[in-house]
Amino acid sequence: EQSFIAFLEDSIQKNWDLDALTDYKGATLQYKDVARKIEKLHIIFELSGIKKGDKIAVCGRNSSHWGVTFLATITYGAVIVPILHEFKADNIHNIVNHSEAKLLFVGDQAWENLNEDAMPLLEGIASLADFSSLVSRNEKLTYAFEHRNAIYGQRYPKNFRPEHICYRKDRPEELAIINYTSGTTGYSKGVMLPYRSLWSNTKFAFEVLDLQAGDKIVSMLPMAHMYGLAFEFLYEFSVGCHIYFLTRMPSPK
């Protein structure tokens, strides 16, 4: 059965205590930490009224929290809109508006140049650094950000365990990602990618690449591009690899 999300669920459960994501000169998340962060984002989405099929944008350098945001969005049933952080502010505003994103998760550098008033459809903006709320335009969202840890604690008094994971099953033709290209003329154009595309690329990688759980890899290409996303993050995460992110470019000695 073709389910991309099943790859993710299977990997998190099997590799629970293995290292998953590390930021350059930053913290390491194990697969269980990723699962727990996904769960807290699901609580925010649920309490703030995000529905299946709603769009959630992410814009920032590759990082552990970029990956967590991506995984939380698709396992919830929302559509992820990855945006290259190098895009100019008016292009980012345009993509957020054109995609009709309800939430934007943004890195510190990208956020400095953005203007929230230029993105009127957003219900909220959150920081990729620590998942704190930067802008909230509805009370439910404000409540969700303030109470996510308390609600998580009520739901999982003995913490979140592998058996708690029961992600939805995706359908091959269901929309997973809207990927905006670097527009050569005018603004970027959105490419609509179904789950079939994620599943087939990941399955292809399983067949031709030979990574094992616990192997270490560096994610260098931007995850807002499909190639970097598919072959330096999604496949490796599905295998149980330990992925390192260059959250900033190392300066040459």
Regions found by a protein language model. Name each.
Residues 1-2:
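Flexible, non-catalytic linker and terminal segments flanking ANL/adenylate-forming cores
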Residues 30-32, 167-168, 176-200:
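Conserved AMP-binding A3 loop
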Residues 35-40, 172, 191-212, 217:
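Conserved structural elements of the adenylate-forming
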Residues 48, 75-153:
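Structural core segment of the AMP-binding/adenylate-forming
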Residues 55, 61-81, 85-89, 97-103, ...:
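A short helix-loop-beta submotif of the ANL/AMP-binding
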Residues 199-216, 223-253:
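Conserved AMP-binding/adenylation subdomain of ANL enzymes
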